[in-house]
Amino acid sequence: MTVTDIDPRLARFEPGVRGAARDLWRRLRQGELGSIPVVLGLIAVWIYFQSANSNFLSSGNLTNLMLQIASFGTISVGVVLVLLLGEIDLSVGYVSGLAGATMAVLNVKSDWPAVWAIVAGLAVGAGIGLLQGLWVTKLRVPSFVVTLAGFLAWQGALLHVLGSTGSINVTDETITDLAGTFYSDAVGWTLAAIAIGLTVLGVIRRRRRSQAAGLVGVPLREDLFKVVVVSVGAIVAVAVFNDDRGVPLAGLIFLGFVLVTDFLTRRTVFGRHIYAVGGNAEAARRAGIRVDRVRTVVFVLASTMAAAGGILAASRVLAANQSSGGGDILLNSIAAAVIGGTSLFGGRGSAWSALLGALVIGSIANGMDLIGQKSDIKFMVTGAVLLLAATIDAVSRRGRLASGRA
C-alpha cells in the first residue's frame, strides 16, 4: 500500500499531548465518547462538594439524594423517549401533578383502595399521552404547541381536582411506603448479586450468539469492563445504602423504569423503530415503519412515566397540592435527559441518560444546599451545565454531519 492509500482519518493522528488532545476533540465532535463526559462531570461535581462539605458523600446524604431524584428522574426516562423521536413534551410536569392529585383524591375522599387509586393515576397519565399523541400525529400540530397547551390545561385540571382546599394529605401506608420503604441488608446484597449475575449471563449469551453467527463481536476487554463497572457500581451502591437505612424502594422503582426502557429501546423491534423515526422519519416511513403509531405510543409511555413520577412525589411529601408538578420539575426532567446525553435533534440517546443526568442535577442541588448556597446560584449553575450539554450535543451533531454519520 502506498502513502496515498492511507485512510485520511489515520493521517490526522499526532503523537504526544497535542495529538491526544486533537483526537479527543475529534471524538467529542463526532459523538464517539458516549457517556464518558457525563460520568467525568459527575465525578468532578462529587469531588468539589465533598471537599466543600465532608457530609456530601455520607451514606445518609447519598440515600437522600436518591430519594430526591427518583421522582423527576422517572419523568425524565419518558422525556428521553420523546426526545429520541426529535419531539418535545412540555406537559410532563403537570401530568405528574395531576396523576398524584387524582390518586390522592380517589384514595382519601372517595375511599378507593390505594392500589386502584395508583392504577387510576397511571391511567390518567396514559390517557393524556394518548390524547396528545393523536393530536400530534392525526392533526399534524407540532408537539411543542400541543404539549405547551397541555402544560396550561393540566395545571388547571390539577387545581380543579384538588378543589377549594388546594391540598390533600396522603396517609395510606401502601402509598406512603413507595417512598418510605427501605430494604434490609440481605435484600440489598441479593439484588446486587442478581444484577451482577444477569450482566455476566448477558455478556456470555451475546458472545456465544456472535460466535455462532460468525460475526465479529464486541472486544472481550469491553465486555469485561462492563462487568467490572456493573459489579463495582452495584456493590458500592448497596454498601452505601445499607450503611444508612437500606436500599430505598423509590430508587429501585426509578432504576426499574430505566432498565425496562433500556431493554425496550435496545432489544426490541419497537425500540429500533423509535431510533429510526428520530433519525429520519421520512426514511422510516418508506421502510414500512408506522411512524404515527410509534409517535403515539411514545407519548403514551412518556405521560405514563410522568404519572408514575408524580405518584412517587406525592408519596415522598405525603400530599398532593397546588404546587405538585410545578416549580422546576419540568425543567429538571428535560435537563436531566439532555445533560445525560440524549440529543435534542432525535435519534441518539438512551434510558441511562435520565439516570446520569438526574444524578448530575440532583447532586448540584443537594450540594448547593449543603454548602448554604441560595436558590439563585443553584439555578444559574444548573442552567450553565444544561447549556454546556446542549452545546456539546450541537457540536457533536455538526461533526457527525460532516463525517456523513448523521
PLM features: what roles do these ranges have?
Residues 205-221, 260-299:
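Membrane-helix/interface signature in polytopic inner-membrane proteins
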Residues 114, 143, 166, 173, ...:
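Loop-to-transmembrane alpha-helix initiation sites
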Residues 111-152, 357, 361:
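Alpha-helical transmembrane segments within multi-pass membrane transporters and channels
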Residues 1-43, 166, 197-228, 236, ...:
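Cytosolic-side transmembrane-helix boundaries in multi-pass membrane proteins
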Residues 87, 129, 299-306, 310-380:
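Transmembrane alpha-helical segments in multi-pass inner-membrane proteins
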Residues 151-265, 322, 402-406:
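Transmembrane helix-bundle core of multi-pass membrane transporters
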Residues 43-110, 133-144, 159, 283, ...:
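Single transmembrane alpha-helix segments in multi-pass membrane proteins
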Residues 54-64, 161-163, 238-251, 262-266, ...:
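Inter-helical junctions in multi-pass inner-membrane proteins, predominant
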